[in-house]
Amino acid sequence: YYTCLNNVLESKPRIVIDDGCDLIFLAHKEYPDVVKSMYGACEETTTGIVRLRAMHKDKALKFPVVAVNNAYSKYLFDNRYGTGQSVIEGILSATNTLIAGKNVVVIGYGWCGRGIAQRLKGLGAKVHVVETSNSAPDGPSGYHRALEALYDGCWVGTLDEIADKGDVFISATGNKHVINEKHMNKMKDGAILANAGHFNNEIDLNGLESISASSKEILPNVDKYELKNGKHIILLSKGRLVNLSQPTGQGHPIEIMDASFATPVSYTHLTLPTKVEV
C-alpha cells in the first residue's frame, strides 16, 4: 500500500484525489518539494476530513483541499446506501449469521451509521445506537444524532450500558478505540465485532489481545478470540474495513461508486489556477 503511495508521489502530481488523507499526509511528511508544486487535492472520506481539519488547525496544510465527502452527491448516497448495504453483506458473507432478532449495536450515527442501522432494521434486528461525538464542526452534534436515532426507532445509550447485551457490534465513527478492552471484557459469549469506519484502530486490537488466552482464524476474515474470562469473541477482517476486506467484503455496488468517483473528478477544477485549461 505504502509502496503505491510513494510511487504516486514520486511521479510529482499536481492534483491528488485522496481516500483517508494518507496520500496528502505522506506528501506533507516526506515530499515537501511535491507539496510546493501542487495545486490542491480532493478528499473522499469522513476520516480523511477529520485528519485534514487537524492539519489545518495546526497550520500544517500547505495547499487547498476540497472536502468531497461533504458533498450531497457523496454522503447522501455512498455513505448511507453504499456503506449500509456493503457492510451488512460483508458480515453475512463472513459469518452466515442470522440478523433477525439479534441485538446489533451501531456505534456512530453519521450517514454511514444510519445507513447500516436502516438496513439492519429491515432485516429484523433490534438496533441499538451509541453516539460517541459531543460536537461537530459543520453538522449536528452527537447529541442531535443520538436523538435522531431515537426518533428513528433505535435504542440509544452508551456502550457501557449495552456491551453485555449486544450480539453484533459495528463501529462507524472514524475515531480510535471506540470499542476498548473494558467493553470487550463485558461482552457476551460469541459476540461479533466489525469495523465499518476507516482504519483498523476503531477496535482496540492490542486490548483484545491482552484479555485473550488464544486466538485463531476459523474462516477467511473470521478470527476467534478465547478470552481469559472463559468467553470468546469473533473479530471480522482483523479489525479492518469489513466491507472491503477480500474475500468476504466486496465493497460498494458499482452504481454507487460511479457517482462517488464522478464527484471528486468534477471538483478538481476548483483546485486549478485560472490560467490552466481543463
Regions found by a protein language model. Give the residues of each.
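Rossmann-fold NAD(P)-binding glycine/threonine-rich loop
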Residues: 48-58, 197-232
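Conserved small/polar residues in nucleotide/adenosyl-binding loops
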Residues: 267-274
